[in-house]
Regions:
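Rossmann-like dinucleotide-binding cores of NAD(P)H-dependent redox enzymes
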Residues: 169-172, 176-207, 211, 298-345, ...
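A conserved FAD-binding loop/helix module that cradles the flavin
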Residues: 295-297, 433-458
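Beta1/beta-strand and adjacent pyrophosphate-binding region of the FAD-binding site
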Residues: 142-155, 280-288
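Feature captures the FAD/FMN-dependent oxidoreductase FAD-binding
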Residues: 141, 146-148, 198-247, 345-357, ...
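FAD-site-proximal beta/loop scaffold in flavoenzymes
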Residues: 251-282, 366-437
Length: 496
Protein backbone atom coordinates (compact mmCIF):
# COMPACT_ATOMS: atom_id res chain seq x y z
CA UNK A 1 0.00 0.00 0.00
CA UNK A 2 1.38 3.42 -0.97
CA UNK A 3 1.30 5.94 1.86
CA UNK A 4 -0.34 9.31 1.25
CA UNK A 5 1.70 11.57 3.51
CA UNK A 6 -0.29 14.80 3.08
CA UNK A 7 -3.78 15.77 4.15
CA UNK A 8 -6.41 16.63 1.56
CA UNK A 9 -6.49 20.24 2.77
CA UNK A 10 -3.94 22.66 4.13
CA UNK A 11 -2.48 21.39 7.41
CA UNK A 12 -3.94 21.09 9.99
CA UNK A 13 -7.46 21.82 8.65
CA UNK A 14 -9.40 24.37 6.59
CA UNK A 15 -10.39 27.50 8.53
CA UNK A 16 -11.71 31.01 8.11
CA UNK A 17 -9.28 33.71 7.09
CA UNK A 18 -7.97 35.69 10.07
CA UNK A 19 -9.46 38.92 8.70
CA UNK A 20 -12.88 37.27 8.53
CA UNK A 21 -12.64 36.33 12.22
CA UNK A 22 -12.48 39.95 13.44
CA UNK A 23 -15.50 40.49 15.67
CA UNK A 24 -16.89 37.20 14.37
CA UNK A 25 -17.97 34.41 16.71
CA UNK A 26 -18.75 31.91 13.94
CA UNK A 27 -16.80 28.66 13.97
CA UNK A 28 -13.18 29.10 12.88
CA UNK A 29 -12.74 25.55 11.61
CA UNK A 30 -14.40 24.84 8.26
CA UNK A 31 -15.85 21.38 7.46
CA UNK A 32 -14.67 18.89 4.88
CA UNK A 33 -16.78 18.20 1.83
CA UNK A 34 -17.94 14.62 1.29
CA UNK A 35 -15.17 14.07 -1.23
CA UNK A 36 -12.54 15.48 1.15
CA UNK A 37 -13.77 13.37 4.07
CA UNK A 38 -13.68 10.18 2.00
CA UNK A 39 -10.24 10.99 0.59
CA UNK A 40 -8.82 11.83 4.02
CA UNK A 41 -10.31 8.68 5.58
CA UNK A 42 -8.71 6.59 2.84
CA UNK A 43 -5.30 7.73 4.12
CA UNK A 44 -5.83 5.50 7.18
CA UNK A 45 -3.68 2.37 6.85
CA UNK A 46 -6.00 0.31 9.13
CA UNK A 47 -3.32 -0.76 11.59
CA UNK A 48 -3.61 -4.19 13.12
CA UNK A 49 -3.03 -2.59 16.52
CA UNK A 50 -4.45 0.93 16.23
CA UNK A 51 -2.56 3.09 18.71
CA UNK A 52 -4.98 5.94 17.95
CA UNK A 53 -7.69 3.92 19.69
CA UNK A 54 -5.51 3.05 22.66
CA UNK A 55 -4.67 6.68 23.44
CA UNK A 56 -8.27 7.90 23.14
CA UNK A 57 -9.85 8.17 26.61
CA UNK A 58 -13.12 6.94 25.06
CA UNK A 59 -11.47 4.24 22.93
CA UNK A 60 -13.20 5.67 19.86
CA UNK A 61 -13.27 3.17 16.99
CA UNK A 62 -11.12 5.33 14.72
CA UNK A 63 -10.24 2.49 12.41
CA UNK A 64 -13.84 1.41 11.89
CA UNK A 65 -14.88 5.03 11.31
CA UNK A 66 -12.18 5.64 8.70
CA UNK A 67 -12.92 2.41 6.84
CA UNK A 68 -16.61 3.26 6.65
CA UNK A 69 -16.11 6.90 5.62
CA UNK A 70 -13.60 5.89 2.94
CA UNK A 71 -16.28 3.80 1.24
CA UNK A 72 -18.96 6.47 1.76
CA UNK A 73 -20.90 4.57 4.44
CA UNK A 74 -21.59 7.39 6.91
CA UNK A 75 -24.27 5.51 8.84
CA UNK A 76 -21.83 2.76 9.77
CA UNK A 77 -19.15 5.32 10.60
CA UNK A 78 -21.59 7.12 12.90
CA UNK A 79 -22.57 3.97 14.79
CA UNK A 80 -18.93 2.90 15.14
CA UNK A 81 -17.98 6.07 17.00
CA UNK A 82 -21.35 6.64 18.70
CA UNK A 83 -20.80 3.33 20.51
CA UNK A 84 -18.51 4.90 23.09
CA UNK A 85 -19.01 8.62 22.46
CA UNK A 86 -22.35 10.35 22.97
CA UNK A 87 -20.89 13.79 22.13
CA UNK A 88 -19.26 13.10 18.77
CA UNK A 89 -19.48 16.59 17.31
CA UNK A 90 -18.47 18.22 20.57
CA UNK A 91 -15.33 16.18 21.09
CA UNK A 92 -14.35 16.36 17.42
CA UNK A 93 -14.08 20.12 17.88
CA UNK A 94 -12.58 20.48 21.35
CA UNK A 95 -10.25 17.47 21.67
CA UNK A 96 -6.52 18.22 21.26
CA UNK A 97 -6.19 15.35 18.77
CA UNK A 98 -2.98 16.56 17.18
CA UNK A 99 -1.42 17.86 20.39
CA UNK A 100 -1.74 14.84 22.68
CA UNK A 101 -4.30 12.25 21.56
CA UNK A 102 -5.25 10.18 18.49
CA UNK A 103 -3.62 12.21 15.73
CA UNK A 104 -0.38 12.52 17.64
CA UNK A 105 -0.31 8.70 17.88
CA UNK A 106 -1.26 8.11 14.22
CA UNK A 107 1.40 5.98 12.51
CA UNK A 108 0.88 7.84 9.23
CA UNK A 109 2.21 10.89 11.05
CA UNK A 110 5.59 9.24 11.43
CA UNK A 111 6.02 9.55 7.66
CA UNK A 112 4.19 12.83 7.09
CA UNK A 113 0.96 14.45 8.23
CA UNK A 114 -1.25 12.25 10.46
CA UNK A 115 -4.76 11.35 9.36
CA UNK A 116 -7.17 14.18 10.26
CA UNK A 117 -9.21 12.03 12.62
CA UNK A 118 -10.96 14.97 14.27
CA UNK A 119 -12.07 16.42 10.94
CA UNK A 120 -13.40 13.06 9.76
CA UNK A 121 -15.26 12.61 13.04
CA UNK A 122 -16.68 16.10 12.71
CA UNK A 123 -17.90 15.36 9.18
CA UNK A 124 -19.70 12.22 10.39
CA UNK A 125 -21.36 14.07 13.27
CA UNK A 126 -22.45 16.94 11.01
CA UNK A 127 -23.82 14.44 8.48
CA UNK A 128 -25.92 12.74 11.15
CA UNK A 129 -27.17 16.05 12.56
CA UNK A 130 -27.90 17.80 9.27
CA UNK A 131 -28.53 15.07 6.68
CA UNK A 132 -29.67 11.76 8.13
CA UNK A 133 -30.65 11.45 11.78
CA UNK A 134 -29.80 7.97 13.00
CA UNK A 135 -31.77 5.83 15.48
CA UNK A 136 -31.08 6.14 19.19
CA UNK A 137 -28.81 3.44 20.64
CA UNK A 138 -30.59 0.32 21.83
CA UNK A 139 -31.24 -0.06 25.54
CA UNK A 140 -31.59 -3.17 27.66
CA UNK A 141 -34.85 -3.95 29.43
CA UNK A 142 -35.61 -1.94 32.56
CA UNK A 143 -33.81 -3.01 35.71
CA UNK A 144 -36.22 -1.13 37.95
CA UNK A 145 -33.24 0.71 39.41
CA UNK A 146 -32.89 4.49 39.54
CA UNK A 147 -29.78 6.69 39.41
CA UNK A 148 -29.59 10.41 40.15
CA UNK A 149 -26.78 12.39 38.52
CA UNK A 150 -25.78 15.74 39.99
CA UNK A 151 -24.38 17.79 37.13
CA UNK A 152 -25.23 17.87 33.43
CA UNK A 153 -21.77 18.46 31.99
CA UNK A 154 -19.74 16.04 29.86
CA UNK A 155 -19.14 13.53 32.69
CA UNK A 156 -22.78 13.52 33.76
CA UNK A 157 -24.10 13.24 30.22
CA UNK A 158 -21.76 10.38 29.32
CA UNK A 159 -22.71 8.51 32.48
CA UNK A 160 -26.42 9.09 31.93
CA UNK A 161 -26.24 7.72 28.39
CA UNK A 162 -24.50 4.49 29.41
CA UNK A 163 -26.68 3.92 32.47
CA UNK A 164 -29.79 4.37 30.35
CA UNK A 165 -28.48 1.83 27.84
CA UNK A 166 -28.08 -0.61 30.71
CA UNK A 167 -31.79 -0.22 31.48
CA UNK A 168 -31.63 2.01 34.54
CA UNK A 169 -33.88 5.00 35.14
CA UNK A 170 -31.74 8.15 35.10
CA UNK A 171 -32.40 11.72 36.25
CA UNK A 172 -29.90 14.57 35.82
CA UNK A 173 -30.06 17.49 38.26
CA UNK A 174 -28.42 20.57 36.75
CA UNK A 175 -27.94 23.94 38.41
CA UNK A 176 -27.94 25.90 35.14
CA UNK A 177 -30.95 26.19 32.80
CA UNK A 178 -29.15 24.20 30.08
CA UNK A 179 -27.08 21.02 29.86
CA UNK A 180 -23.43 20.94 28.90
CA UNK A 181 -21.57 22.27 31.93
CA UNK A 182 -18.17 23.75 31.12
CA UNK A 183 -18.55 22.71 27.49
CA UNK A 184 -21.57 25.03 27.32
CA UNK A 185 -20.45 28.09 29.24
CA UNK A 186 -16.66 27.74 29.09
CA UNK A 187 -15.91 27.00 25.43
CA UNK A 188 -16.41 29.90 23.01
CA UNK A 189 -18.85 29.58 20.12
CA UNK A 190 -16.08 30.04 17.53
CA UNK A 191 -14.59 26.80 18.83
CA UNK A 192 -17.76 24.85 19.71
CA UNK A 193 -21.06 26.14 18.32
CA UNK A 194 -23.85 25.89 20.87
CA UNK A 195 -26.23 24.17 18.47
CA UNK A 196 -23.86 21.19 18.18
CA UNK A 197 -23.69 20.58 21.94
CA UNK A 198 -27.40 21.31 22.37
CA UNK A 199 -28.32 18.75 19.72
CA UNK A 200 -26.12 16.04 21.21
CA UNK A 201 -27.41 16.65 24.73
CA UNK A 202 -30.98 16.49 23.41
CA UNK A 203 -30.28 13.10 21.83
CA UNK A 204 -29.36 11.74 25.27
CA UNK A 205 -32.57 13.18 26.68
CA UNK A 206 -34.49 11.56 23.82
CA UNK A 207 -33.28 8.17 25.08
CA UNK A 208 -35.47 8.69 28.14
CA UNK A 209 -33.11 10.47 30.53
CA UNK A 210 -35.04 12.83 32.80
CA UNK A 211 -33.75 16.36 33.27
CA UNK A 212 -34.33 18.78 36.14
CA UNK A 213 -32.59 22.10 35.46
CA UNK A 214 -32.32 25.09 37.77
CA UNK A 215 -31.79 22.76 40.73
CA UNK A 216 -28.76 23.19 42.97
CA UNK A 217 -28.33 20.01 44.96
CA UNK A 218 -27.17 20.86 48.45
CA UNK A 219 -29.27 24.01 48.47
CA UNK A 220 -32.61 23.48 46.71
CA UNK A 221 -32.63 19.81 47.70
CA UNK A 222 -30.30 17.97 50.04
CA UNK A 223 -28.04 15.20 48.77
CA UNK A 224 -29.40 12.82 51.39
CA UNK A 225 -32.97 13.65 50.36
CA UNK A 226 -31.98 12.97 46.78
CA UNK A 227 -30.51 9.66 47.85
CA UNK A 228 -33.88 8.53 49.14
CA UNK A 229 -35.30 8.96 45.63
CA UNK A 230 -32.64 6.88 43.89
CA UNK A 231 -30.74 3.62 44.29
CA UNK A 232 -27.41 5.33 43.54
CA UNK A 233 -26.07 8.82 42.96
CA UNK A 234 -23.28 10.23 40.82
CA UNK A 235 -21.57 13.53 41.63
CA UNK A 236 -20.38 15.21 38.42
CA UNK A 237 -20.41 18.89 39.35
CA UNK A 238 -17.22 19.81 37.52
CA UNK A 239 -14.56 22.40 38.30
CA UNK A 240 -15.92 25.81 39.27
CA UNK A 241 -13.82 27.01 42.21
CA UNK A 242 -11.57 29.81 41.02
CA UNK A 243 -8.15 30.35 42.55
CA UNK A 244 -8.31 33.13 45.11
CA UNK A 245 -7.34 36.57 43.86
CA UNK A 246 -4.64 37.66 46.29
CA UNK A 247 -2.73 40.09 44.08
CA UNK A 248 -2.94 43.65 45.48
CA UNK A 249 -5.44 45.70 43.49
CA UNK A 250 -7.62 42.74 42.53
CA UNK A 251 -10.65 44.65 43.80
CA UNK A 252 -10.19 47.47 41.29
CA UNK A 253 -12.82 47.98 38.61
CA UNK A 254 -11.71 46.39 35.37
CA UNK A 255 -10.08 43.35 37.00
CA UNK A 256 -12.22 40.37 36.04
CA UNK A 257 -12.39 36.65 36.74
CA UNK A 258 -11.78 34.85 33.45
CA UNK A 259 -14.14 31.96 34.13
CA UNK A 260 -17.01 34.25 35.06
CA UNK A 261 -16.20 36.33 31.98
CA UNK A 262 -16.59 33.33 29.65
CA UNK A 263 -19.75 32.23 31.43
CA UNK A 264 -21.33 35.68 31.19
CA UNK A 265 -20.49 36.05 27.50
CA UNK A 266 -21.46 32.58 26.30
CA UNK A 267 -23.87 30.89 28.74
CA UNK A 268 -26.94 32.78 27.55
CA UNK A 269 -25.79 33.03 23.95
CA UNK A 270 -23.20 35.43 22.61
CA UNK A 271 -25.86 37.21 20.52
CA UNK A 272 -27.71 38.21 23.70
CA UNK A 273 -24.50 39.37 25.31
CA UNK A 274 -23.63 41.54 22.31
CA UNK A 275 -27.02 43.22 22.62
CA UNK A 276 -26.37 44.07 26.28
CA UNK A 277 -22.63 43.86 27.04
CA UNK A 278 -21.75 43.97 30.74
CA UNK A 279 -17.93 44.17 30.59
CA UNK A 280 -16.09 47.44 30.05
CA UNK A 281 -12.86 46.06 28.60
CA UNK A 282 -11.54 49.17 26.88
CA UNK A 283 -8.99 48.76 24.10
CA UNK A 284 -5.99 47.41 26.03
CA UNK A 285 -6.66 44.07 27.69
CA UNK A 286 -4.22 41.93 29.66
CA UNK A 287 -5.08 38.25 30.18
CA UNK A 288 -3.20 36.56 33.01
CA UNK A 289 -2.59 32.83 32.54
CA UNK A 290 -1.31 30.32 30.02
CA UNK A 291 -3.94 27.58 29.80
CA UNK A 292 -6.94 26.91 27.59
CA UNK A 293 -9.20 29.27 29.50
CA UNK A 294 -6.69 32.12 29.27
CA UNK A 295 -6.47 31.63 25.52
CA UNK A 296 -10.27 31.47 25.23
CA UNK A 297 -10.60 34.68 27.26
CA UNK A 298 -8.01 36.45 25.12
CA UNK A 299 -9.50 35.45 21.77
CA UNK A 300 -12.98 36.35 23.03
CA UNK A 301 -11.73 39.76 24.21
CA UNK A 302 -10.17 40.30 20.77
CA UNK A 303 -13.53 39.76 19.13
CA UNK A 304 -15.35 42.01 21.59
CA UNK A 305 -12.90 44.92 21.57
CA UNK A 306 -11.01 44.65 18.27
CA UNK A 307 -8.28 46.22 20.37
CA UNK A 308 -4.92 45.15 21.77
CA UNK A 309 -5.10 41.94 23.78
CA UNK A 310 -2.02 40.43 25.42
CA UNK A 311 -1.63 37.13 27.24
CA UNK A 312 0.84 37.38 30.10
CA UNK A 313 2.32 34.07 31.26
CA UNK A 314 4.86 33.36 33.97
CA UNK A 315 6.64 30.65 31.97
CA UNK A 316 7.48 30.50 28.24
CA UNK A 317 5.40 29.41 25.25
CA UNK A 318 6.97 25.94 25.40
CA UNK A 319 5.43 25.36 28.84
CA UNK A 320 1.93 26.57 27.93
CA UNK A 321 -0.50 23.64 28.46
CA UNK A 322 -2.43 24.54 25.31
CA UNK A 323 -2.81 22.99 21.87
CA UNK A 324 -0.22 24.68 19.64
CA UNK A 325 -2.80 25.00 16.87
CA UNK A 326 -4.96 27.23 19.06
CA UNK A 327 -2.00 29.42 19.97
CA UNK A 328 -1.25 29.89 16.27
CA UNK A 329 -4.89 30.76 15.58
CA UNK A 330 -4.71 33.41 18.29
CA UNK A 331 -1.56 34.89 16.79
CA UNK A 332 -3.23 34.96 13.36
CA UNK A 333 -6.03 37.00 14.92
CA UNK A 334 -3.60 39.54 16.37
CA UNK A 335 -3.16 38.15 19.87
CA UNK A 336 0.07 39.17 21.59
CA UNK A 337 1.91 37.03 24.13
CA UNK A 338 4.39 38.12 26.80
CA UNK A 339 6.35 35.54 28.75
CA UNK A 340 8.24 35.23 32.03
CA UNK A 341 6.03 37.81 33.72
CA UNK A 342 3.70 37.48 36.72
CA UNK A 343 1.40 40.15 38.19
CA UNK A 344 2.73 41.75 41.37
CA UNK A 345 0.06 44.44 41.72
CA UNK A 346 -2.80 46.01 39.81
CA UNK A 347 -2.57 49.79 39.96
CA UNK A 348 -5.43 52.16 39.32
CA UNK A 349 -6.74 55.70 39.25
CA UNK A 350 -10.17 56.65 40.49
CA UNK A 351 -10.85 53.07 41.51
CA UNK A 352 -10.18 51.59 38.05
CA UNK A 353 -7.14 49.64 36.90
CA UNK A 354 -4.75 51.55 34.62
CA UNK A 355 -1.61 49.43 34.74
CA UNK A 356 -0.20 46.20 36.10
CA UNK A 357 3.16 45.90 37.80
CA UNK A 358 4.78 42.67 36.65
CA UNK A 359 7.52 40.66 38.30
CA UNK A 360 10.06 39.45 35.77
CA UNK A 361 10.58 35.69 36.08
CA UNK A 362 13.18 33.17 34.98
CA UNK A 363 12.89 29.42 34.61
CA UNK A 364 14.25 27.25 37.39
CA UNK A 365 14.21 23.53 38.07
CA UNK A 366 11.49 21.15 36.88
CA UNK A 367 8.55 21.09 39.31
CA UNK A 368 5.76 18.59 40.03
CA UNK A 369 3.97 19.56 36.80
CA UNK A 370 6.91 18.32 34.75
CA UNK A 371 7.70 21.85 33.59
CA UNK A 372 10.46 24.22 34.63
CA UNK A 373 9.25 26.35 37.51
CA UNK A 374 9.03 30.17 37.29
CA UNK A 375 11.40 31.95 39.67
CA UNK A 376 11.18 35.70 40.48
CA UNK A 377 14.23 37.73 39.47
CA UNK A 378 13.38 40.72 41.66
CA UNK A 379 13.02 42.96 38.61
CA UNK A 380 9.65 44.57 37.79
CA UNK A 381 8.07 46.30 34.80
CA UNK A 382 4.76 48.15 34.34
CA UNK A 383 2.24 47.34 31.61
CA UNK A 384 -0.53 49.82 30.85
CA UNK A 385 -4.05 48.42 30.47
CA UNK A 386 -7.73 49.27 30.46
CA UNK A 387 -8.75 45.91 31.92
CA UNK A 388 -7.31 42.65 33.21
CA UNK A 389 -8.83 39.19 32.87
CA UNK A 390 -7.41 36.68 35.35
CA UNK A 391 -7.58 33.02 34.23
CA UNK A 392 -5.00 31.25 36.35
CA UNK A 393 -6.65 28.04 37.46
CA UNK A 394 -9.90 26.43 38.48
CA UNK A 395 -10.26 23.70 41.05
CA UNK A 396 -13.00 21.15 41.71
CA UNK A 397 -16.45 22.44 42.63
CA UNK A 398 -16.40 21.98 46.42
CA UNK A 399 -19.96 23.06 47.22
CA UNK A 400 -21.40 19.57 47.79
CA UNK A 401 -18.35 18.33 49.65
CA UNK A 402 -18.72 21.16 52.14
CA UNK A 403 -22.47 20.68 52.39
CA UNK A 404 -22.30 16.94 53.10
CA UNK A 405 -18.95 16.35 54.76
CA UNK A 406 -17.92 13.67 52.26
CA UNK A 407 -14.21 12.85 52.23
CA UNK A 408 -12.05 15.04 50.03
CA UNK A 409 -8.60 15.04 48.50
CA UNK A 410 -6.28 17.82 47.30
CA UNK A 411 -7.98 21.18 46.67
CA UNK A 412 -11.27 19.82 47.97
CA UNK A 413 -11.69 17.26 45.18
CA UNK A 414 -14.07 14.40 45.93
CA UNK A 415 -12.11 11.41 47.22
CA UNK A 416 -13.08 8.10 45.58
CA UNK A 417 -12.11 4.45 45.92
CA UNK A 418 -11.19 2.01 43.15
CA UNK A 419 -14.88 1.71 42.24
CA UNK A 420 -15.29 5.51 41.99
CA UNK A 421 -17.44 5.45 45.14
CA UNK A 422 -17.13 8.34 47.58
CA UNK A 423 -17.06 8.02 51.36
CA UNK A 424 -20.88 7.97 51.20
CA UNK A 425 -22.37 4.57 50.44
CA UNK A 426 -23.95 4.41 47.00
CA UNK A 427 -22.63 7.84 46.01
CA UNK A 428 -20.09 7.87 43.17
CA UNK A 429 -18.11 10.69 41.53
CA UNK A 430 -16.53 11.43 38.15
CA UNK A 431 -15.05 14.21 36.06
CA UNK A 432 -13.46 17.49 37.05
CA UNK A 433 -14.95 17.39 40.56
CA UNK A 434 -12.47 14.53 41.14
CA UNK A 435 -9.50 15.63 39.02
CA UNK A 436 -9.81 19.38 38.73
CA UNK A 437 -10.01 21.10 35.35
CA UNK A 438 -9.33 18.63 32.55
CA UNK A 439 -10.31 17.71 28.99
CA UNK A 440 -13.94 17.16 28.00
CA UNK A 441 -13.09 13.71 26.62
CA UNK A 442 -11.37 12.69 29.87
CA UNK A 443 -14.36 13.80 31.93
CA UNK A 444 -16.59 11.74 29.64
CA UNK A 445 -14.38 8.68 30.05
CA UNK A 446 -14.62 9.02 33.81
CA UNK A 447 -18.38 9.39 33.55
CA UNK A 448 -18.62 6.16 31.55
CA UNK A 449 -16.37 4.34 34.00
CA UNK A 450 -18.51 5.55 36.90
CA UNK A 451 -21.64 4.39 35.07
CA UNK A 452 -20.09 0.95 34.68
CA UNK A 453 -19.24 0.76 38.39
CA UNK A 454 -22.72 1.96 39.36
CA UNK A 455 -24.22 -0.71 37.11
CA UNK A 456 -22.10 -3.36 38.83
CA UNK A 457 -23.07 -1.96 42.25
CA UNK A 458 -26.79 -1.97 41.51
CA UNK A 459 -26.81 -5.48 40.07
CA UNK A 460 -24.45 -6.73 42.80
CA UNK A 461 -21.99 -8.06 40.24
CA UNK A 462 -19.20 -7.67 42.77
CA UNK A 463 -15.62 -6.78 42.03
CA UNK A 464 -15.20 -8.95 38.95
CA UNK A 465 -15.06 -5.79 36.91
CA UNK A 466 -16.10 -5.88 33.30
CA UNK A 467 -13.51 -3.98 31.29
CA UNK A 468 -15.43 -0.99 30.05
CA UNK A 469 -13.89 -1.09 26.60
CA UNK A 470 -14.31 -4.81 26.04
CA UNK A 471 -18.02 -4.72 26.84
CA UNK A 472 -19.99 -3.23 23.97
CA UNK A 473 -23.60 -3.17 22.94
CA UNK A 474 -22.51 -3.59 19.34
CA UNK A 475 -19.97 -6.35 18.81
CA UNK A 476 -16.58 -5.55 17.31
CA UNK A 477 -14.83 -8.19 15.29
CA UNK A 478 -11.11 -9.01 15.28
CA UNK A 479 -10.69 -8.83 19.02
CA UNK A 480 -11.41 -5.39 20.39
CA UNK A 481 -11.64 -3.63 17.05
CA UNK A 482 -14.34 -3.45 14.45
CA UNK A 483 -13.22 -4.41 10.94
CA UNK A 484 -16.45 -4.55 8.96
CA UNK A 485 -20.24 -4.34 9.11
CA UNK A 486 -22.09 -7.24 10.68
CA UNK A 487 -24.67 -7.46 7.90
CA UNK A 488 -25.80 -3.99 8.87
CA UNK A 489 -27.09 -5.28 12.21
CA UNK A 490 -26.33 -4.37 15.78
CA UNK A 491 -26.11 -7.09 18.39
CA UNK A 492 -27.24 -6.41 21.93
CA UNK A 493 -25.54 -8.15 24.81
CA UNK A 494 -27.69 -9.87 27.44
CA UNK A 495 -28.00 -8.15 30.82
CA UNK A 496 -24.87 -8.54 32.95
Amino acid sequence: MSLNTQRVSKFPFPKRDAKEREGNFEEVQLPYTLEEAMAEASRCVTCGNPVCIDVCPLQLDVRGMCEAVARGDMATAYHRIRETNALIGTTSRCCPQLDSLCEKACVVGSQGEPVAIGMIQRFVSDWERNVSRQPDPKTLKSTGMSVGIVGGGPAGLAAAELLKRYGHSVTIYEELPVLGGTAWYGIPDYHLPKDVLQYEASRIVDMGVRIKTGVRVGKDIGLYDLGSDHDALLIATGAKDVSKFDTPGSDLKGVYDGYRFLEDVFAGGVEKYLEHPTYDLGKRVLVIGGGDSALDCARTALRLTRGEVTIVYRRTEVEMPVDEILIEEGKEEGLKLKFLLAPKAYVGEGGRVTKTTMTVMKLGEVDASGRRSPVPTGETIDMGCDSVIVAIGRGPNTFLQKATGMATGPKGAVAIDENRMTSLQGVFAAGDVVTGESLVVKAMAQGREAAQRIHEYLLKIGKEHISLYDYYFTRRTSGRYYTGMLDGKEETLPPA
